[in-house]
């Protein structure tokens, strides 16, 4: 069994050579300070990985490190999780350090697994435990890759598939083992850890905000044990989930599209589907997420929405595209951020809350009818002249990769341009167009050291920048805020909508909008789209 591991020697040893010394060393470490502790631990794991030790002793040391190390890694991840790309230098350093530690820990368990599998006949518990530990580190590694808006590369999937293939060959992939660090008192297995990695990749974690990513990662860990391994696909899937297919000899993750190969296996998610559907129903009946073992920090309605999302991706064959996507090319301009988009679509004029009374508005309309222009007061002109946003250079240059009627995939050099992240309101100007189209940045990924890619959902219709405010009970009104109106499009079955700041929506909430110096009133009916900073609501 060859995992392409570097050789070992005795030239430079870590500060501990047995589990007891390792625990004593950890007791002296500043584990509460991830910035200090992580590089110190990383150096010792690197030395341990290259130092010759009996595999049983190496395994005992890794087990002593694993619990405290997981807490340090969780603390370090808070520095980069959910942050826009490119990361700031301190955020990038935290990400690099975190991924480096997971890589070294995975290699350490791999070394133990390879050595003990050769020496053992497969009937002892050691190989089953080692396979589960190795695969579980790969799962933690994948979660932090997605938190840093990266995807596992081919070498990751090759090693993951190799380990699980070896566990299958030894007949221990489904053997129950304990893992107090990740599963408490519940039993787990190598198959459950491998299934967890599969659930993580099919969930497209990088599209989620940091809080929701943590929920789905927790669910994948908890429910990986519900997946079953099949040698052949089910003959009749009418009452079953759509199985995932994986080639254990490949360097690719599982998918719903089987290929012609002799090393393919299927992962059946039928039991998981039953569990998800039951939870969705109970949430709709008013049960609390914590009662359904979704987590004490999980809230509604986000819990139900996320369960529906993973149900589609884990059990129903993935999410089909509404419109066919095809290759495209050309440069496009992108503006990211609610305020910047409003500024650009307003003719690069800064936002000022409407403050004139009804009589003033009537007089200005009369002036417009007579003179053809709206006269501005001296304070209005002075406010615009003093506004710093007029100097904004808010449009970044991107390159179009593919497109559909409702979406785009674009790319740009990684370090050039502003920071972008999932959930931002954006405006994009397509090749050959003079106008911007409004949309949402669905995801952003660092594809290499030099490339940043992003996926965009386009909103139909020509957006109109307006001022909006909430109508409270009685005569109370909220402050004027930036917003956008989008027309209804009957051919696309798209209702008229308004884009408001996140947190505005309530069913039947009254909204007023100032449009061309005229007040319009309407009610919010339902949320059509939402992001970190906006909600698009039908009216």
Question: Where do the model's predicted regions map?
Answer:
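Short, flexible coil/linker segments at or flanking structured domains
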Residues: 10-14, 19, 41, 53, ...
